[in-house]
Amino acid sequence: MSHVANKLLVTCALPYANGSIHLGHILEHIQADIWVRYQRMRGKEVHFICADDAHGTPIMLKAQQLGITPEAMIEEMSKEHQQDFAGFNISYDNYHSTHSEENRQLSTKIYLALKKNGHIKSKTISQLYDEEKGMFLPDRFVKGTCPKCKAPDQYGDNCEVCGSTYSPTELINPRSVVSGSTPVMRETEHYFFDLPAFSNMLQEWIRSGALQEQVANKMQEWFDSGLQQWDITRDAPYFGFEIPDAPGKYFYVWLDAPIGYMGSFLNLCEKRGDLSFDEFWNKESKTDLYHFIGKDIVYFHSLFWPAVLEGSEYRKPTNLFVHGYVTVNGAKMSKSRGTFITARAYLDHFDADCLRYYYAAKLSSRIDDIDLNLEDFVQRVNSDIVNKVVNLASRTAGFISKRFDGKLAANLDDAKLYQHFVDMQESIAQCFENREFGKAIREIMALADEANRYIDEKAPWVVAKQEGKEAELQAICTMGINLFRVLMTYLKPILPSLTERSEAFLQTELTWNALSQPLLNHEITKFKALFNRIEMDKANAMVEASKSTIAPVKEITGPLADAPIQETIKFDDFAKIDMRIAEIKQADFVDGSDKLLKLILDLGGETRQVFSGIRSAYPDPKVLEGRLTVMVANLAPRKMRFGISEGMVMAAGPGGEDIFLLSPDSGAKPGHQVK
């Protein structure tokens, strides 16, 4: 790849906040983290950020199914996602959410800049509408047959089989994912981003040679079929940011989602105080911006995103690093087979370094799918990490501790061999730089084989039994420890947990620059097991656990679906509310209002006037007179055009005629406090 700047901003695609992280997701975050850790080892200033993609109809509907607000759901998802990434040692500098004030401000600013520069068009469109649910259907909530390749069961925005994009109205035999009904067409006004206006700029980007060949080729296919204006609007109900000056219209999630990269970085700048947002995002920035993404979202990142940035006068990405999908045991991940494995299920059974190593061994700069074969996974981890690398230290460290009080020799037994290991750093560095992690591991394991052959030939266990061979034994074991140190330095970006334990054992930090100088006359600690073998039984247990933990979300219907439970509050906040029993002494219509009733309430020594929106439920207000009810007594008086309302009566129900005034049990009296 081309020269990397000294300052880098690196992102992973934003996980969607409606489900758990699984082993398909984690591939990308491991890939990016390895590259980031390598760049940091080489002295680069790297800012590694991510966020939850927290908007859209799927989140709104799932929260409704769960009977909670979208805000409450995405908050819990964010906590879970961050715990999972921490469990895999993903070294983010900041993890944020697209449902943030930073993202709202930036989305609005970018939209207004695009509009000012003439890149936003409006037009009336016909859109699919679910009459059963009373809502316009976003593209991901329509399924049907792809109009291009005729693949069945495809979403309304793009085909997962042929990669084509289209509008939901082009689907053959569309159906609503929400209700299963056949949608009808209705007209609505939408705003569009003028993507074709950026065709020349985007084609220059293709010809620059920076993009992966497979990405550039796919982009050319899209150009050949013609770019279309991009609908950036969604109709209410929708969980997201409302478009300025367009009530009831919301930004499509794919407009504000990539802006989430900027929002997360802005949040980091605000936290740190010593970072400049403009230095990394202004049009003339000298820094590098890299996005690690999956091949399923190339279209949005290679066309829409750079065009949106160009149109709003921000810098474009330096490059996209695209990876393929993950299969398990040669097949698509399956909940029924237990191969739909969540990050948490994996971490309950294995060290994160095991999967980091296995994925790294299979990763290249190409967009190839990766198969997680569990038998191969167990065999490779044991063969490479345990038998080849850690075993090198365990075969020599004991002699150093027992015979030489933990002190390494003053000289190496084979300085030429050590120099050969050090000389490989340039080749291995190039592999890391170019994201050819599999090649890097092959080169490192070839060195590990050489190191173990050296120990086999020198046989320190034999030398230890020979009198007068102490210096030779110390030199051989010192050599083995130093070769282990070189190998672990090369593996440091991949195996952070093992590296940390190895640094404690060696009592030195493993750095690229220190490789030229071996550890001599240096004291190490007593060797303890650095890494344990893994067993197939645990892999089988993980699969079984995954079968039992993946369960369909129980759909909540009725009142909780219509009015989800709000976010939790602290007890101290609840305790501030003073609810009292009140007798309705008088109830009358309010002139000029078809919703309100005027209630005169007796609190047992004090009278209050309250305006309540319950007229539809009580067409004869006189039936309320003499009833006891519950009121919020310490609500601040509210001035209305009909008079002052001095509290609020408590009622239940969805609204309209279905409102039911609350009444206390017998024995309660006006003025009693509700506890």
UniProtKB/Swiss-Prot annotation:
SUPFAM superfamilies: Anticodon-binding domain of a subclass of class I aminoacyl-tRNA synthetases, Methionyl-tRNA synthetase (MetRS), Zn-domain, Nucleic acid-binding proteins, Nucleotidylyl transferase. It catalyses: tRNA(Met) + L-methionine + ATP = L-methionyl-tRNA(Met) + AMP + diphosphate. Its EC number is 6.1.1.10. ATP binds at K335. One of its GO terms (biological process) is methionyl-tRNA aminoacylation. Binds 1 zinc ion per subunit. Its cofactor is Zn(2+). Is required not only for elongation of protein synthesis but also for the initiation of all mRNA translation through initiator tRNA(fMet) aminoacylation. This is Methionine--tRNA ligase. It comes from Proteus mirabilis (strain HI4320). The gene is metG.
